[in-house]
């Protein structure tokens, strides 16, 4: 039976660099599991190094146009296809990224909930944009008391709950009970690059400075030219929001950098918590890139024997 390796960890921990070294040593296939690195035309703001976008060993990087509607369900289907193709070629395979919802879907599966019609999705987005998260949350709560389980700051979850109820008349939580999740792959091994926070923060800060000094501002100008809705996933990416505020004249460029650094550190803090609580008990946590490279090379070599 094939074993699927998943490499995750907080933002800026060095997952991509580890995957590059392992791919070069073993010739394995790397499949993206970062919900922002799927997008085309914005490599700097999403930290897509050139090798991620150009090497045939690296899959599902920079392949979705920012204006396209995309979801975790679509990503899971794309990822399953790429994994099975790699296994057909007898290529060792690692799924790499830090997006919790994507990782969870790959490990635990998704409930089979009917998709919403396009006009309902548009209605949900328009309402959220008009009234804001708090009022939108309260409107949902009147329909379904279980909505209290949703973080009102999470626009994607609020929108999905609205869409499901509007489309089917049934709560998304009821659908999840009716349609239990089915694991896409039974044999997964999760490896977590987990550096100490005090080591991660300087890397986050320097990475944001490098992004701004490169082409991040031009990329955000391009996104703004597309007239995407404010709640489009790429428009909510850390770095994008702050640069938009700068381009609109609301803050200075140094203030935008500071805000992006602060928001990225807060995001990393949430990732640390999620990684400790939501992964399988046998997930392997390692603090350094060197240890993770050694571990993955060893485990992949053993598995291929």
Swiss-Prot record:
Cofactor(s) in the UniProt record: Mg(2+)
E.C. designation(s): 2.5.1.75
Keyword Acyltransferase among UniProt keywords: no
Top-level taxon: Bacteria
Coiled-coil boundaries: none
GO terms assigned for molecular function: ATP binding; tRNA dimethylallyltransferase activity
NCBIfam families: miaA
Protein name: tRNA dimethylallyltransferase
